[in-house]
């Protein structure tokens, strides 16, 4: 019986990060940790492209534009920080971004990981951005690397 499994080696991989700028300090920390993780697992600076967009809502459209271009990637990591406010706007954005990214992953049959921090407060958003605690960018990049290496075996 054969079992296929990805591994944590970014050597020779081409990965894109599409990160929002809104909630800038947290978003910058999220993107930075994502970039560092790619390099930590053997990826090269030439194998990594980072694209920054104004907000999380712009991430799915930017990913689609990227995937429709001549450039080829093994995986994409979507990074953004959304903090719940007093209106329903937060829920609308979170749902649209997640649905859009999921649809693109299926449409293009490409690993696109969701490193979108969706938090009820700035304190929790900081915890998920890597300043204190779990870093969603790190987990998103490690998942992207594992999935990209798995897809080369299928």
Swiss-Prot record:
Its EC number is 2.5.1.78. InterPro entries: LS, LS/RS, LS/RS_sf. One of its GO terms (cellular component) is riboflavin synthase complex. 5-amino-6-(D-ribitylamino)uracil binds at residues 22, 56-58, 81-83, 114. GO terms for molecular function: 6,7-dimethyl-8-ribityllumazine synthase activity. Pathway: Cofactor biosynthesis; riboflavin biosynthesis; riboflavin from 2-hydroxy-3-oxobutyl phosphate and 5-amino-6-(D-ribitylamino)uracil: step 1/2. The keyword Transferase applies. One of its GO terms (biological process) is riboflavin biosynthetic process. It holds the Pfam family DMRL_synthase. The active site is at residue 89. (2S)-2-hydroxy-3-oxobutyl phosphate binds at residues 86-87, 128. PANTHER family: 6,7-DIMETHYL-8-RIBITYLLUMAZINE SYNTHASE (PTHR21058:SF0), 6,7-DIMETHYL-8-RIBITYLLUMAZINE SYNTHASE DMRL SYNTHASE LUMAZINE SYNTHASE (PTHR21058). Belongs to the DMRL synthase family. Catalyzes the formation of 6,7-dimethyl-8-ribityllumazine by condensation of 5-amino-6-(D-ribitylamino)uracil with 3,4-dihydroxy-2-butanone 4-phosphate. This is the penultimate step in the biosynthesis of riboflavin. This is 6,7-dimethyl-8-ribityllumazine synthase. It comes from Chlamydia pneumoniae (Chlamydophila pneumoniae). The gene is ribH.
């Amino acid at each position: 019986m054969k079992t296929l499994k990805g591994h944590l080696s970014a050597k020779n991989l081409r990965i894109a990060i599409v990160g929002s700028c809104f909630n800038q300090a947290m978003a910058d920390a999220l993107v930075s940790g994502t970039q560092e993780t790619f390099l930590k697992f053997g990826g090269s600076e030439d194998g990594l492209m980072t694209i920054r967009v104004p907000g999380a809502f712009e991430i799915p459209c930017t990913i689609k534009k990227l995937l429709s271009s001549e450039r080829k990637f093994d995986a994409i990591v979507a990074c953004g920080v959304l903090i719940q406010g007093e209106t329903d706007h937060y829920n609308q954005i979170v749902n649209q971004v997640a649905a859009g990214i999921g649809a693109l992953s299926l449409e293009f049959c490409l690993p696109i990981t969701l490193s979108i921090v969706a938090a009820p407060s700035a304190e929790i958003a900081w915890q998920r951005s890597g300043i204190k605690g779990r870093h969603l960018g790190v987990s998103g990049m490690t998942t992207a690397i594992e999935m990209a290496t798995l897809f080369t075996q299928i």
